[in-house]
């Protein structure tokens, strides 16, 4: 395999899908040497097959707003790879959603799910619907209209969606209600991220953030150190950042910065239970602003238009969108003396930012490893649904911690360089790829 040749073909075929091409290029660069040591992969054209989704569903979503006006959005489901299990991946409702973003997310999800060692393939979906400023009734009507098409292609052994940006427990509930009506069966295994009263798993809302902090903790332990007493900056203030802030605080770190589209919050006193709970209130307001945090807590200061990375910290954890942390941000982070950066959002750093971190020799880990706790706990929710049982918080947390430990070990196994530096990007990509590639090889050309 020659990465440049394959990328040239994909760029000619999908010239406008920059996010998808970026994700594919990162993986191919990481695996090229290992791949070329396996002629059986080349003979079966594994790479050429693995970079293309198995199926893409695109559909119209028509709904009525509170003013009685008819609105139309586009819905998608990208069923990327089912070599190791049913398609599994979230639904994103955001105006930026397009096919390139969902293909990149589905591609990343394939390897992320493989890293968990749970039997889950990769998929992703969503819509360009913007929940911001919408009433509960409007969101319900949209979710119901969205499910009118999606229900035809999902199921516990076929495709199991979950939440993502713009899709939380409320939206999952609305969609499941419509699914149940259409399918005429009570099958909670068709979606994850459900409410606790009807088949959801303890800790699922917090799981992505919890798992990310566990992964960071393992990274620090590799250096014989801990995260207790260290300062943390997070971007975002939704479920992911909330979970990360909660677990980091529990482990003794001090979360001093969060951010939103309107700017950044700096709180030198760090987070406590009241402040962490208020993050969820801000997200639930649908206003997508973080400034009110500084109005409520006198110790906090709001910086309009700034990012969390402008604040000096030990650990930087982007928790919002793809490519949110740029090369300019990386320069600022390095100048501030940050010694660990971990993507909690999917592909949260640009390639230039990652290169800057690796050149500087600081610890850096990619989203497909760091944020795998979310889908891992979704997998645990699927298991509980299939077995008709419910595990305690301690049981789920123990299993989550063990999964994140195993992912870290896999990254170290494949990512340790001759000079001792751990290239977590390379390690995660190779570990995930090898599992999926071997499964595809054994299942024949399909």
Q: Model features per residue range: what roles?
A:
Residues 1-202, 435-443:
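N-terminal ligand-binding/catalytic initiation module
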Residues 2-23, 219-220, 334-446:
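Adenosine-phosphate binding glycine-rich loop
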Residues 68, 164-165, 201-208, 233-237, ...:
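Active-site nucleophile and cofactor-binding loops and adjacent substrate-binding regions
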Residues 138, 170-177, 202, 243-247, ...:
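Short acidic, glycine/serine/threonine-rich loops at helix termini
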Residues 195, 200-310:
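Glycine-rich phosphate/diphosphate-binding loop of Rossmann-like nucleotide-binding domains
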Residues 263-364, 369:
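Rossmann-like adenosine-cofactor binding region
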């Amino acid at each position: 395999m020659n990465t440049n040749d394959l990328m040239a073909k994909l760029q000619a075929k999908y010239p406008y899908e920059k996010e998808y091409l970026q994700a594919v290029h990162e993986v191919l660069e990481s695996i090229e040497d290992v791949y070329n040591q396996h002629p059986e992969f080349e003979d079966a054209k594994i790479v050429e097959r693995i970079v293309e989704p198995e199926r893409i569903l695109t559909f119209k979503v028509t709904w009525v707003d509170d003013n009685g006006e008819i609105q139309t959005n586009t819905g998608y489901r990208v069923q990327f790879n089912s070599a190791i299990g049913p398609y599994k991946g979230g639904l994103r409702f955001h105006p930026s959603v397009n096919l390139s973003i969902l293909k990149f997310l589905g591609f990343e999800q394939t390897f992320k799910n493989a890293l968990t060692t749970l039997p889950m393939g990769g998929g992703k979906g969503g819509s360009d619907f913007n929940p911001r400023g919408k009433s509960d009734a409007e969101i319900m009507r949209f979710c119901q209209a969205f499910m009118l098409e999606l229900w035809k292609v999902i199921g516990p052994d076929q495709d199991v969606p979950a939440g993502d940006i713009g899709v939380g427990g409320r939206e999952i509930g609305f969609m499941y209600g419509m699914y149940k009506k259409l399918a005429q069966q009570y099958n909670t295994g068709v979606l994850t991220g459900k409410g606790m009263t009807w088949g959801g798993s303890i800790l699922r809302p917090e799981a992505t953030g919890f798992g990310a902090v566990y992964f960071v903790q393992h990274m620090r332990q590799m250096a014989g150190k801990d995260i207790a007493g260290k300062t943390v900056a997070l971007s975002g203030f939704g479920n992911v950042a909330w979970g990360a802030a909660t677990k980091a605080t529990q482990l003794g770190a001090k979360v001093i910065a969060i951010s939103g589209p309107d700017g950044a919050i700096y709180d030198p006193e760090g987070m406590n239970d009241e402040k962490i709970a208020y993050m969820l209130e801000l997200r639930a307001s649908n206003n997508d602003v973080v400034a009110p945090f500084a109005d409520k807590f006198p110790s906090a200061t709001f910086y309009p238009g700034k990012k969390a990375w402008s604040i000096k910290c030990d650990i930087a954890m982007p928790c919002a969108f793809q490519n949110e942390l740029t090369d300019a941000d990386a320069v600022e982070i390095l100048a501030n003396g940050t010694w660990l950066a971990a993507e909690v959002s999917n592909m949260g750093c640009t390639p230039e930012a990652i290169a800057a971190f690796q050149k500087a020799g600081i610890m850096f880990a990619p989203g497909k490893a760091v944020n795998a706790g979310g889908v891992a706990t979704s997998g645990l929710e699927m298991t509980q649904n299939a077995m008709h049982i419910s595990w305690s918080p301690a049981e789920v947390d123990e299993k989550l911690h063990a999964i994140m430990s195993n992912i870290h070990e896999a990254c170290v196994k494949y990512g340790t360089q001759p000079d001792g530096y751990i290239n977590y990007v390379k390690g995660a990509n190779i570990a995930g790829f090898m599992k999926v590639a071997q499964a595809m090889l054994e299942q024949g050309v399909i």
